[in-house]
UniProtKB/Swiss-Prot annotation:
Biased composition (Polar residues): 16-28, 101-112, 503-538, 1314-1325
Native organism: Penicillium rubens (strain ATCC 28089 / DSM 1075 / NRRL 1951 / Wisconsin 54-1255)
Entry protein name: Sterol 3-beta-glucosyltransferase
Domain PH as annotated: residue spans: 285-382
Family: Belongs to the glycosyltransferase 28 family.
Gene Ontology molecular function terms on file: sterol 3-beta-glucosyltransferase activity
Function noted in UniProt: Sterol glycosyltransferase responsible for the glycosylation of ergosterol to form ergosterol-glucoside.
Domain GRAM, residue spans: 234-283, 704-770
Bilayer topology: Peripheral membrane protein
Top EC category: transferase
GO process terms (BP): autophagy; carbohydrate metabolic process; lipid glycosylation; protein transport; sterol biosynthetic process
Keyword Cytoplasm: yes
Amino acid sequence: MRPLRDDAKRRADRQLSASMKPTSSNRPFSDRVPDRFKDGDDAQFDFTAPPRGMGSRDGNVHYMQQSLFSMIAAVGSKSDFHARFDESSDSDGEMEEQPRVEQTTGKASSRTPPVPSLDPRQPSKRSEPSKLVLEERGRRHQRACSDNKLLQRLPKSDAEGGVNESSNQSDSLLKVPPLRRTRSATPRAAPVLSRMVEAQSHFDLTSATPYLPPNNPDKSMEDQPQSSASALSMRLMKMFEFAKPEKVLVEYACSLLQSMLLQGYMYVTEGHICFYAYLPKKSNVAIKSGYLSKRGRKNPKYHRYWFALKGDVLSYYADPSNLYFPSGHVDLRYGISASLTERKDGDAKDFQVTTDQRTYLFRADSATSAKEWVKALQQVIFRTHNEGDSVKVSFPIANVIDLEESPMADFAETFKIRVIDSGETYAIDEYFFSFFDSGQDAFNYIKGLVNAVSTTTATKEAQDQHDIKHQPESSRTAYKRQSVSSVRVSDQRREDSPRKRSSSVGNENQGSADSFAEQGTGSSPIIQSMTDTTESASQILHRSDVFQAPTMRTLQGRSLDVGESIRRYSDDTTPSASARLDLDAAVGSPCGTLGHNETTEDARYATGQSDLMQSSRPSSVTQLNELVKAGVYPLQRAAGFAEYLKSRSKQMSTLLATESMGYIEKVSGMWIGGQKHYGEREGPLLEDQNVDPEDNEGSFNYGDRFRAHFALPPTEKLQATYYAYLHRVLPLYGKIYISQKKLCFRSLIPGTRTKMILPFKDIENVEKEKGFRFGYHGLVVIIRGHEELFFEFNASDSRDDCAVTLHQNLESVKFLVESGLLAEDERDEVEAAKAEHRMLEEARLDSPEGHDAPPTLTEDSSEIHPFFDDPRASIINFKPPEPLRITCLTIGSRGDVQPYIALCKGLLAEGHKPKIATHAEFEPWIRKHGIDFAPVDGDPAELMRICVENGMFTYSFLREASLKFRGWIDDLLSSAWIGCQGSDLLIESPSAMAGIHIAEALRIPYFRGFTMPWTRTRAYPHAFAVPENRMGGAYNYITYVMFDNIFWKAIAGQVNRWRNNELGLKATTLDKMQQNKVPFLYNYSPSVVAPPLDYPDWIRITGYWFLNEGTDWTPPTELSNFIAQARSDGKKLVYIGFGSIVVSDPSALTRTVIESVLKADVRCILSKGWSDRLGDPASTKTEIPLPPEILQIQSAPHDWLFSQIDAAAHHGGAGTTGASLRAGVPTIVKPFFGDQFFFGSRVEDLGVGICMKKLNVSVFSRALWEATHSERMIVKARNLGIQIRNEDGVATAIQALYRDLEYAKTLARQKSLASSTPFSPTPTAKASPDGGDDDLDDIEEWTFVGDETGFDIAKRMRERAASDADRIGSNMFQ
């Protein structure tokens, strides 16, 4: 069998990509690079290397990741600080059940293909596939049908004589459902034999009787005049499938009440009472999340998990910061009810969720929380039962028994309508309607209408019975056939009005006698009314048969899947009733499956036709024999292998006696590894290796099993699978699943149950690397806001194939517009429901009756309102009532000061009094913007020189800093203390080192703000410790721990001496400072550095704090002419500027830049600042003449300059990177020290630029060409620029200040109470000269101690307090 065209093309692309030679970078080229950009002789040379002798012997700078943290890199992947290995918290009960399909591996469990439409009016194709595809589908279908031997060809009726039989040959075949259902999105299936007998009986009945077309509302509309009916009447006739338009007497805006509050409209017509509610839904929004305790299946102990209710799935996690690895889930698509569990004390904290397989027990922290969870779960279960985006209820007025007022709340009037279901069973349904206005008028009007109709209906029934009694037998028989196959019965009293549930098929299929799936629903109201004698709180969740789908359809080719139809039948009937079906009686009596609401005369008719049916169908015994043959077929394939194993292993022969060969095949295939790709129908493609063609014919359950494993919707189609190791604490062997929108993993080792569900929209990039073990090949998945994931494959072909497949899916997902609605395949249904709702609104407003009821839900609404839920708290304005004196403390270069100027300008606009404390050289710049200034000592150029010449925190850096910076740090601390006096709030860059202690002494709230990651996380490494290769979350986290300890050890002595002498505070330690508790404001974009999932609530990534100075800047004439000339020549324009750096050969670097620009054929704006020593005046002068393609400038505002160019190449500083990304241009980064390596890696991970490890003509020229010609990179950079420009970082930061201000005040009070002395600027009443026991309680109150026991805490804190008191006492008497 040949694969589909798109699959063949995908396979060809994959093979080509896999065969490409690996480049020096993991970044794939989107465009074919010209041959002139191949690596030359200088490819391994770096012209930005510092002078020989500076930092190391070989002249290369030893950055931080190459010195101190090299030992961390060796063991980083073996460390674990957050229990990354998901083990079961309760060994005897928490194991989630395996999908039922795995219990019957060897049986005929292949997924049934969709049932073709049998209505000749409906086309059977979706979009116009090619002839090859149609023929292939037909061959596949016929081959599967011939193997099954359980199918009947429907004979053509007279009504279908005009249809070409040959063209619909495959469409006339129907498959019997599988023996065991798979846990897919389809509803629960009825017992297999019951369904099979019912289907056979229905087929025989329809084949022995002439075809009677159902009443088509659309056709009836064309045959009758429409002038007498209003637009609203016509619309209601279509939506509720009335036989003719009915005049709308009155309408009301009301709500249908059960466990939900469904806002909609009630329409009272001449013959019916109708209710319509439009319910748009969104599946990508978390409805509710929080901590709950879950009880194991066998273990009565409760275990605490983090729960998230999203879409149709309730998932729970051991760690809320690791949401891609759920510990388990509850699939609410199979949910029956959610209810509180009553307790004797009356405080119901426990609740349970019942599904078709088991009952889950939960315990909340409070009774209120339990009620909120139950309401949220009931909402989701309700939506899963109502498959459409609208709810429709309709019943004849003649069936209404009575109305009764039922007051439930003071703000609404509620009454109950009791309706009889049918004349045979007299089952009664109750509907509660709540009116916020005109409730009494509605009650009186409907009650009077019911009383007026009751007499007329009784007279009409007597006349109808008299007419039927005198009808000829043939006429009566035709009437009975009509009652079985039609949607409605002509008798109004017995009318099974349009009270079916919503479905995904059109109206024609619902009314068709050939669609047997809908026939089973006819008896559901009666059966459920007989079994459920009392109305439960969640009956609306179970009684889903009253709902209907939108009747206005845009999908012409959607056909009903057999599994969906059978599941629909099962949900709409009582499970106990279907379980009681006797096989012998069912086989012997075809009428046993017609429904309980059929009269005895119906049974006699069906029995009388049995002789005619007997000649046209095989016996039931023959069919059952064929069924047994189909089930045994997999065992026949395994006969030879089973005999071989049987002679050698008695245990294996016992296994084979009970299990099919599929188990052995799966286990052997699992350890062999490899990959499989799946086509449109989720069968493996024959071009894949180790794929049996016979497996392809019966493999349509691959996708069902995949969706059942991970509780995914039916629209998530399986595309490829791979066997690989997931590296967490230990390599975990399992299976990778790739679908349209998700990357999933499931462990296959017994005793483990790790599962991963990773949406493609959260994946930033995929890179190929070496494996951790010899002979294995690694694949790194870079995730937005999460640590990297490492996979290992035993074959490079599988790794390359997986990488190419992931890149293809990432590209398709990134360019899709996220609508926030359901899956793409369901958008047509959503649009149909929207259109139906919109047309009904227009008809209602344009109706001449003058309906003026207010609108209810809009199309943008996404929630079902819980009934009488507690109102949400209003949004509180956290802005302080009085203006604050805010000081911003920072040191460093111009890029460190500029963000604070932008923030202070925003604070000025808010009415506050900001001040910036920094180096004196920036005072004129700061005061120009109307911001107060305070000087801080220290020469930033000297610090920059040490960093550039020695690398960040290398051994030589620490040695020189300890010799030259002792006095520098003392002056910095003292001047910062003076500059922060009189402040109400302090915001500090942590590099200033003094702010946290000053805020503690002044007892004022303290915030931190910085341009690079400084808070511990597993998602990113410390900005000063970026490794050359990705090391994983353990390494990332430990870099912060090591940096904090090294940084504190270097300054602890001076800081504690300064605290004692000038601040009057006790000496402190790293633990006591609790830096990880300080609220933090990061001034970079969340689109560039996504907030890690393990960040606490007080860590905010606000967006860039841009200072827009380019609007007032006038460019020189030479620069304007150069830009205009480049545009007129059609040349790409780039900016190159690496700042003030020290290189060994400045002229060689200049020559490299010139040759790279000429080779890339671009025009360049150059900002030169490199030299062989820092501060050299000749750094801005060029050593060699510049060609006319390059223009050198001294300075220009980045916001103006970057908007004029096509690409930017710079050193990767935080401010410069933010400016180039904001302009939406591709960015080339050549990092030198500090945080530049971190932002360079982020640029490359986002696909918006290139990070170069070395700079030479070969690498730089190719990077310039790709940045200016790669459409993939250009589009990504443009989209990222749009996102950044839409952010308002300053406003977000100010709102975060207001929100966390009270939290910061609390921290300040706790710390000041613990560390104050009589010499503090703000002494406390508890402080005593000898540091008595009064302080110990406060110390224990705020000190972070981790997981230590209470005894260890008290002992350790008392020892620390005594030591601190002795130290202070000795200092006082010295």
